[in-house]
């Protein structure tokens, strides 16, 4: 299935690329999420008339993500209190949603989908370097400190 990308998609292409993808990936992910349209002669012609508009929108999204990364830098370390035992083990865990909520509470909007935890949830008190994928091209590292909280 050939599609025209309407925005940059990681490991696939950039705005305007005509790429061949598996039918399921195209129908179930790219088309419903608005990241691509099917490549027909009419859609290619329509895309060429909208190309500048789409590229400007993509550049604006990237600039916005870079701005959010600078704001997150200004926050410094994010501290999250969690109920923990004497040895530093948490009763429960700190996940992507908790980290996103803590950053949002500090003043910068971050969704849980933007928080990348490749090794799973955090289960011990300590300092962690967490990747935030704010845009396809913008990855930012934030320091998260988990402390034992007597009130949690």
From Swiss-Prot:
A single Gene Ontology biological process assigned to it is: translation
Pfam families in the record: Ribosomal_L9_C, Ribosomal_L9_N
Q: Does the keyword Chloroplast apply?
A: no
Keyword set, alphabetical order? Ribonucleoprotein, Ribosomal protein, RNA-binding, rRNA-binding
Mention any one GO cellular component term assigned to this protein in its UniProt record.
ribonucleoprotein complex
The UniProt GO MF terms for this protein read:
rRNA binding; structural constituent of ribosome
Query: Which InterPro entries does this UniProt record tie to the protein?
Result: Ribosomal_bL9, Ribosomal_bL9/RNase_H1_N, Ribosomal_bL9_bac/chp, Ribosomal_bL9_C, Ribosomal_bL9_C_sf, Ribosomal_bL9_N, Ribosomal_bL9_N_sf
Protein family membership: Belongs to the bacterial ribosomal protein bL9 family.
The free-text function statement in the UniProt record for this protein reads: Binds to the 23S rRNA.
NCBIfam families linked: L9
Its protein name is Large ribosomal subunit protein bL9
Organismal lineage: Bacteria, Pseudomonadati, Pseudomonadota, Gammaproteobacteria, Cellvibrionales
């Amino acid at each position: 299935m050939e599609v025209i990308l309407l925005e940059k998609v990681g490991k696939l292409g950039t705005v305007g690329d005509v790429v061949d993808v598996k039918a399921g990936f195209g129908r179930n992910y790219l088309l419903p999420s608005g990241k691509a349209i099917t490549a027909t002669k009419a859609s290619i012609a329509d895309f060429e008339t909208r190309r500048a508009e789409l590229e400007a929108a993509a550049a604006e999204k990237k600039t916005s993500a870079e701005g959010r990364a600078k704001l997150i830098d200004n926050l410094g370390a994010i501290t999250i209190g969690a109920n923990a035992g004497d040895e530093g083990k948490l009763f429960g865990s700190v996940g992507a949603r908790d980290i996103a909520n803590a950053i949002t509470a500090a003043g910068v909007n971050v969704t849980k989908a933007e928080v990348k935890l490749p090794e799973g949830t955090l289960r011990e008190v300590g300092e962690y370097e967490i990747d935030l994928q704010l845009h396809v091209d913008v990855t930012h590292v934030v320091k998260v400190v988990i402390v034992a909280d007597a009130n949690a």
